[in-house]
Amino acid sequence: MATALPRTLGELQLYRILQKANLLSYFDAFIQQGGDDVQQLCEAGEEEFLEIMALVGMASKPLHVRRLQKALRDWVTNPGLFNQPLTSLPVSSIPIYKLPEGSPTWLGISCNSYERSSSSREPHLKIPKCAATTCVQSLGQGKSEVGSLALQSVSDSRLWQGHHATESEHSLSPADLGSPASPKESSEALDAAAALSVAECVERMAPTLPKSDLSEVKELLKNNKKLAKMIGHIFEMSDEDPHKEEEIRKYSAIYGRFDSKRKDGKHLTLHELTVNEAAAQLCVKDNALLTRRDELFALARQVSREVTYKYTYRTTRLKCGERDELSPKRIKIEDGFPDFQESVPTLFQQARAKSEELAGLGSQQAEKGMAKQMELLCAQAGYERLQQERRLTAGLYRQSSGEQSPDGGLPSDSSDGQGERPLNLRIPSVQNRQPHHFVVDGELSRLYSSEAKSHSSESLGILKDYPHSAFTLEKKVIKTEPEDSR
């Protein structure tokens, strides 16, 4: 089944996108549903896009939907791949199927009116080169003939009828249209301000560059025939030759050089243009840098880093001044709110004072902790000393108790002596008169035990010794309890 050919610019754009995605079978369905606006497909939301896919019968084939989405993304990001540059002209209602016979216009726009509009209102506007890039055109030089411009197949019945080969038609060739893919386009150059900044930076850097020896350069060119054939003629030109700088720029370019394999439609970035300009300026100052491209590249990048920052900053400031607006990088300060930029030093001072105060409090806490620890150590030492004294007292008490008789009274000789005494002079045992529980001081207990032994051994049967011994025993009693019944 033959696919219908596009009649408008919108249909042609859709045709190219479907052709890129290998989905030309859906072209008729898109046209029948009125889907000749590619911009609508690109800006459609998820639900709207799925609805369009259902209308054209693509919703049931998700892989086809993915291919179409990828082609749409490529068309937005790099329209040069489709040989269809983006323009500000309407995407529909621009007939390319048939031109009015005998009209000196193309696409409904007069050449003179285009020149006026391109010079006054839209200086960057490019006429779409649909016919020049998508059709096979056969034009005669100075002859009047009818040519056929086939969009896809020469045998197709729908042909675009050609016209007289006028000067206006010749001006629509790809070389004269100034397409974005042309590396010699006027936009592939820095503006005057940026070039001036590069020149100033190179002037400052020039005294620091090492001086090249011309004899070494000639020796290098003599040994390298290929390099000599390429740039040898530049060293033979005089400085007054107007073509010397042009040749230097041609062979000093780092990016997008005439012999580089750069993809069609890819523009040079601001960084690349700056590096190329810096390399050209450096080679003008020192022609020998043409033979040392690695060193030239490093120097050009150094210049680019400095120039790009300064020029971009200055341009932004100038644009903001022209619009009488605040810089996008400046913090907007509302009325009634403090200036936080001015309060930063104050906040810093306050934070510093707080840190010093916290440090002082920390030292005080450390001192208090040390004092507390010393108090605890002293208390512990006193407690240990008290425990030691208590243990000593208990030991002395146990020692004094062990030295006494097993029944708790006086020694056995005392009892024996009492047995020899008359009945009327006998006294009850100390055990019968001494309570069970009493507390005795260590030293007095020891004194009591020694005195008791001496009295019991020296005054057996003597009555006068009893009161003294009884007095001594009465002094030792602290707590009186009933006698033991045993």
UniProtKB/Swiss-Prot annotation:
Primary location recorded for the protein, binned into one broad class: nucleus
Gene3D superfamilies named in the record: NAB conserved domain 2
Ranges annotated as biased composition (Low complexity): 404-417
GO molecular function, one term: transcription coregulator activity
Pfam family, one: NCD2
NCD2, as annotated region: 220-309
Keywords for the protein's UniProt record, in alphabetical order: Isopeptide bond, Nucleus, Phosphoprotein, Repressor, Transcription, Transcription regulation, Ubl conjugation
General function of this protein: Acts as a transcriptional repressor for zinc finger transcription factors EGR1 and EGR2.
Protein name as it appears in the record: NGFI-A-binding protein 1
Annotated organism of origin: Mus musculus
